[in-house]
């Protein structure tokens, strides 16, 4: 690259801003055609995708990247099938753009409502998994937003090959190639440029490790949709159904260990602890889950439960490790969650409506649940069709961010020569 990173990113930003204006007025049929054509292009380019991905995999192995990270890079036939299906599925989702809601007549005679509109240009910064390129591009395209995608340097060849397929789809639908752009430099300065271009970029969505997200949140000059941690809790209330508690707590921890909606801390009311914790501990031990508990938990379950430190209550393990605390009240459980949690997803197991209602009202998290596993905190499971990530912020979007979360609203007013008096 002969031009500077600043000049290159400025050029991408300018092109994205221009393309966003075209995409904002594109019809639903045009956007769906682009998505379907991109899916067909991916299907036809399997050999090219494999060749590009092999370059990334070889470089990753040579650099000593951890095997788990190498696995995340792989574009296996199943992963490519998933990307193709993802594009086609997004094409079937309802288009939120242009929808007008809440129209009402006011005493002055005017009609006022709200129209859903795109955000504009969205910058996506992510690591490792090249299939995120498809997830992000498809949702941004369907919601009428141009996007600039900056994937990890370890997936550069894969991301470029995927982007070429997307742009074939855009061309077939008569949309500008700049609707979806992949940053083609691996220079880390490109990230710094992308997050400090408010004249071209309206929102940043980072997907990656805590360090990446903290840096972007600190340095960005545009709004960021993010979550830092997934410290999720299940609280087994005094009025819990035992079978439900065991089933939910098992699933919330052991279905998968790495997702951000996996339970990391289990809270149990002291009055039910002797009935629920021993059978749960047996399940966890059989599945190789390391248990860390407070003094009451260790006294009940035995010395093989490690002593939980203060850091454990804040921990997102992403591993077969679980922290357990016995509490004396619903108040104590809510206080613990709001103090130590990450405001992601928390669940109560109870048969008391009043306790459930208090939990839903007082726990300050993006998703709060009753008698359900935290693993349900997902855009697909919520009926959103797909998600670009999960936000624990209170502005602009909160929880799983699907198509609607990538839009904004503007007021629309209809009159018939009305003037204000």
Swiss-Prot record:
> Where is the protein situated, by its record's location annotation?
Cytoplasm
Q: Which UniProt keywords apply?
A: Amino-acid biosynthesis, Cytoplasm, NADP, Oxidoreductase, Proline biosynthesis
Any Gene Ontology CC annotation: cytoplasm
Q: What is its EC class? A: oxidoreductase
**In what pathway does it function?**
Amino-acid biosynthesis; L-proline biosynthesis; L-glutamate 5-semialdehyde from L-glutamate: step 2/2
What are the recorded GO MF terms, alphabetically? glutamate-5-semialdehyde dehydrogenase activity; NADP binding
Catalytic reactions on record = L-glutamate 5-semialdehyde + phosphate + NADP(+) = L-glutamyl 5-phosphate + NADPH + H(+)
Question: Looking at the record's lineage, which domain of life comes first?
Answer: Bacteria
Give GO BP annotations, semicolon-separated. Answer: L-proline biosynthetic process
EC number(s) given by UniProt? 1.2.1.41
Any idea what job this protein has? Catalyzes the NADPH-dependent reduction of L-glutamate 5-phosphate into L-glutamate 5-semialdehyde and phosphate. The product spontaneously undergoes cyclization to form 1-pyrroline-5-carboxylate.
Checking HAMAP family in the record gives: ProA
Recorded family membership: Belongs to the gamma-glutamyl phosphate reductase family.
The name this protein carries in UniProt is Gamma-glutamyl phosphate reductase
Organism, as annotated:
Ectopseudomonas mendocina (strain ymp)
Organism placement in taxonomy: Bacteria, Pseudomonadati, Pseudomonadota, Gammaproteobacteria, Pseudomonadales
Gene expressing this chain: proA
